[in-house]
């Protein structure tokens, strides 16, 4: 169990190190995925502040979704974060998938964000 956690932390650190190298001051779209929900936020690492956030736990999103653990829910959250980011004046971001594979819900969130108007 401890080895799995260490491997996850190494993967996450490797991805973040790569992102820092090519960020050029752009905000970071960070994704967190649990077994039942999906969360994302756009973070300004220079200031250490969250600029925009969205999750499948929000009341408006829960009404239309049976669960937050589906690909459809992730795509809706991606479109929502993009809509909020565009309203806040953010168009270009760096996608931070964390230690997760770019597949399934993480990929659906990224596709939804692109459809909503974010560039990465």
UniProtKB/Swiss-Prot annotation:
Keywords: Ribonucleoprotein, Ribosomal protein, RNA-binding, rRNA-binding. InterPro entries: Ribosomal_uL18_bac-type, Ribosomal_uL18_bac/euk. This is one of the proteins that bind and probably mediate the attachment of the 5S RNA into the large ribosomal subunit, where it forms part of the central protuberance. Belongs to the universal ribosomal protein uL18 family. One of its GO terms (cellular component) is cytosolic large ribosomal subunit. Part of the 50S ribosomal subunit; part of the 5S rRNA/L5/L18/L25 subcomplex. Contacts the 5S and 23S rRNAs. GO terms for molecular function: 5S rRNA binding; structural constituent of ribosome. It comes from Beijerinckia indica subsp. indica (strain ATCC 9039 / DSM 1715 / NCIMB 8712). It comes from the Bacteria. The keyword rRNA-binding applies. The keyword Ribonucleoprotein applies. PANTHER family: 39S RIBOSOMAL PROTEIN L18, MITOCHONDRIAL (PTHR12899), LARGE RIBOSOMAL SUBUNIT PROTEIN UL18M (PTHR12899:SF3). This is Large ribosomal subunit protein uL18. GO terms for biological process: translation.
């Amino acid at each position: 169990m401890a080895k799995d956690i260490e491997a996850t932390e190494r993967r996450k650190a490797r991805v973040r190190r790569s992102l820092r190298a090519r960020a050029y001051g752009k905000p970071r779209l960070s994704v967190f995925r649990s077994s039942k929900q999906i969360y994302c936020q756009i973070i300004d690492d220079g200031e250490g502040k969250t600029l925009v956030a969205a999750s499948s736990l929000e009341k408006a999103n829960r009404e239309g979704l049976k669960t937050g653990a589906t690909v459809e829910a992730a795509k809706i959250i991606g479109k929502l974060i993009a809509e909020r980011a565009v309203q806040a004046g953010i168009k270009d971001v760096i996608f931070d998938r964390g230690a997760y594979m770019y597949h399934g819900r993480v990929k659906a969130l990224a596709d939804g964000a692109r459809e909503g108007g974010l560039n990465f």
